């Protein structure tokens, strides 16, 4: 979790009173943050000011600076209400046009203006420190999002955000005296400890993103560095903020956090000047920032049951107010709270987050200790796990050993090595795999079992192994886009293929699950199973593979639940196994 150093005297001034170390430590504990260190004793006799080093949750981006910590604690203590952010003027007078050329490298941008700001030295330092903390945490070292802040009075609106060839971008980088182009900039900062670590983000791109004003003056080269021309100082009165990124959601979160924390220093506190974002090529034209609170619903009964309370909607609303959330009982549904989530609380994603805030507002120390009911102490296996245990026992009784391979595999192992083609509809792929071994989440248990046999091929024959585990398949209709499926698979490896061995094992499994073999399924409409030749499955030797069909009730529609067959010699060669083998795999969830 991030540790935020704040000036002790300034923080206590913002909180309206002084605290002993023990008192402030207790306040932090109640709120869910942690006082890591008080440097008062360490700086005695020096010119340094005492600091409090506070550890905050990684998802509380609003607490990455002293302003946010003080605001959150003051609301928790009841000293103040949540700020009322407002846009002025309501219709933007300044625009930022995003060109289509930015799409391949850094396609999203957001912007806002803070007018008539009054920053003293410590507020200025806090402004810079917040950007650094956001860059290190939410922005993932500027790979996802990068921030630029500028003295608006040195630039001429409207602004454009586009991508140009490196040699065409010429400007004086921050705190430098000489103009250089994009190519020279990469060489100049290559060994710089601060800037050098960000160069790789765009270095190999044929174009670099750049922020320009109406006179084509460079304001920044995101995500590397700002221009010295528009740098902010203690004398800056009007601040233009630009945020660029590859992630739309995180870009919006960052701009909201910046304006929420530092609009308090405007002549009219919490007043923000919007910017018109013009992005016609992808229909992203909008007014930025969007300070409209998000809305969510939470069940009163759910909150009470989780926290152990018996509070009304009004009482819960008072607790949520301490956590910056504006809640009111729904006028339409008796058990529902309508919750407004401010722009500072991007960590609120689900009603469980709202429930957690109720618990913090109530105080964990105030929760009564109660004995759980005896029946709540008795656990029971999930149905899918119970089925899996039955299949494991039956397989073991048949003389098969259980293996537990990894759920990730390489793309080739999951498809090409099994003589299958990836049509893009099944496998969940890792975006940034660390190694070629972990490119996809397996869609079948077979590759893992074959890899296990490969590493144990020196053992005496036959090798009989099985696995009962999850595979993952895509489903775009689901919110998460994919789902887990519990499968059971077995493999027989020997000098002969041993198809009769895996067929016998399948029969034992079905007998254990009280599922009879149907000799003539077209006439016999009972619950049961049968197999039919599968000419399309190229994993198996031609004419030696079949689909397994299952009817889960009398007169019900049958469906294919798996496959059985003799593995193709090429498959065995791909996994470096010099023997013949047969396999069987079924969806175990059909027995639920």
Swiss-Prot record:
Q: Is Metal-binding included in the keywords of this UniProt record?
A: yes
* InterPro entries membership: aa-tRNA-synth_II/BPL/LPL, B3/B4_tRNA-bd, DNA-bd_dom_put_sf, Phe-tRNA-ligase_IIc_bsu, Phe-tRNA-synth_IIc_bsu_arc_euk, Phe-tRNA_synthase-like_B3/B4, PheRS_beta_core, PhetRS_B1
Give the EC number(s) listed in the UniProt record.
6.1.1.20
Q: Organism's domain of life?
A: Eukaryota
As its record notes, the protein acts as a catalyst of:
tRNA(Phe) + L-phenylalanine + ATP = L-phenylalanyl-tRNA(Phe) + AMP + diphosphate + H(+)
List this protein's GO terms for biological process: phenylalanyl-tRNA aminoacylation
Sorted alphabetically, which Pfam families does this protein's record hold?
Answer: B3_4 (PF03483), B5 (PF03484), PhetRS_B1 (PF18262), tRNA_synthFbeta (PF17759)
Which keywords fit this entry according to its UniProt record? Aminoacyl-tRNA synthetase, ATP-binding, Cytoplasm, Ligase, Magnesium, Metal-binding, Nucleotide-binding, Protein biosynthesis
What are its cofactors?
A: Mg(2+)
| UniProt-recorded Gene Ontology molecular function terms | ATP binding; magnesium ion binding; phenylalanine-tRNA ligase activity; sequence-specific mRNA binding
The family line of this record is: Belongs to the phenylalanyl-tRNA synthetase beta subunit family. Type 2 subfamily.
How would you summarize the oligomeric state and partners of this protein?
Tetramer of two alpha and two beta subunits.
Tell me what this protein is called.
Phenylalanine--tRNA ligase beta subunit
Species of origin:
Candida albicans
Q: What is the lineage of its organism?
A: Eukaryota, Fungi, Dikarya, Ascomycota, Saccharomycotina
What gene does this protein come from?
Answer: FRS1
């Amino acid at each position: 979790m991030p540790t935020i150093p704040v000036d002790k005297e300034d923080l206590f001034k913002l909180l309206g009173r002084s605290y002993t170390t023990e008192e402030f430590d207790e306040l932090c504990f109640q709120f869910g943050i942690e006082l890591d260190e008080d440097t008062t004793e360490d700086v005695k006799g020096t010119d340094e000011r005492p600091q409090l080093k506070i550890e905050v949750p990684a998802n509380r981006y609003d607490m990455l600076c002293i302003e946010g910590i003080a605001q959150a604690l003051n609301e928790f203590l009841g000293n103040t209400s949540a700020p009322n952010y407002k846009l002025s003027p309501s219709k933007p007078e300044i625009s930022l046009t995003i060109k289509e050329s930015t799409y391949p490298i850094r396609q999203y941008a957001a912007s806002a203006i803070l007018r008539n700001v009054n920053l003293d030295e410590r507020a200025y330092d806090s402004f810079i420190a917040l950007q650094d903390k956001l860059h290190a945490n939410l922005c993932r070292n500027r790979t996802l999002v990068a921030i630029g802040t500028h003295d608006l009075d040195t630039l001429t609106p409207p602004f454009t955000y586009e991508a140009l060839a490196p040699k065409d971008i010429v400007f004086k980088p921050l705190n430098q005296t000489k103009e250089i182009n994009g190519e020279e900039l990469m060489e100049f900062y290559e060994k710089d400890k601060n800037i050098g670590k960000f160069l790789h983000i765009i270095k190999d791109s044929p174009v670099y993103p750049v922020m320009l004003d109406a006179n084509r003056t460079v304001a920044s080269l995101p995500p590397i560095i700002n221009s010295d021309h528009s740098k902010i100082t203690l004398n800056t009165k009007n601040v233009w903020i630009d945020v660029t990124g590859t992630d739309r959601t995180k870009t919006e979160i960052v701009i909201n956090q910046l304006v929420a924390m530092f609009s308090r220093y405007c002549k009219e506190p919490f007043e923000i000047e919007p910017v018109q974002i013009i992005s016609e090529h992808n229909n992203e034209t909008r007014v930025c920032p969007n300070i409209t609170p998000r809305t969510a619903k939470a069940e009163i009964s759910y909150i009470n049951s989780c926290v152990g309370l018996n509070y009304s909607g009004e009482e819960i609303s008072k607790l949520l107010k301490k956590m910056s959330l504006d809640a009111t009982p729904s006028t339409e549904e008796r058990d529902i709270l309508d919750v407004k989530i401010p722009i500072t609380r991007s960590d609120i994603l689900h009603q469980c987050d709202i429930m957690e805030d109720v618990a913090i507002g109530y105080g964990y120390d105030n929760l009564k200790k109660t004995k759980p009911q005896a029946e709540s102490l008795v656990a029971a296996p999930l149905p899918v796990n119970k089925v899996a245990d039955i299949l494991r026992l039956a397989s073991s009784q048949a003389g098969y050993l259980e293996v537990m391979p990894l759920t990730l595999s390489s793309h080739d192992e999951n498809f090409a090595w099994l003589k299958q083609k990836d049509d893009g509809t099944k496998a969940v792929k890792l975006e940034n795999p660390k190694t070629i071994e972990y490119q996809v989440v397996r869609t079948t248990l077979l590759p893992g079992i074959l890899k296990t046999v490969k590493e144990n091929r020196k053992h005496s024959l036959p090798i009989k192994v099985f696995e009962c585990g999850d595979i993952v398949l895509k489903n775009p209709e689901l919110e998460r886009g994919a789902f887990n499926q519990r499968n059971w698979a077995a493999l027989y490896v020997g000098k002969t293929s041993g198809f009769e061995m895996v067929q016998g094992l399948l029969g034992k499994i079905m007998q254990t699950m009280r599922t009879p073999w149907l000799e003539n399924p077209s006439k016999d409409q009972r619950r049961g199973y049968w197999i039919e030749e599968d000419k399309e499955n190229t994993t198996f030797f031609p004419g030696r593979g079949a689909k397994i069909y299952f009817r889960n009730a009398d007169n019900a529609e049958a469906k294919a639940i798996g496959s059985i067959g003799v593995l193709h010699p090429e498959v065995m060669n791909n996994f470096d196994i010099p023997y013949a083998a047969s396999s069987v795999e079924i969806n175990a969830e059909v027995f639920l």
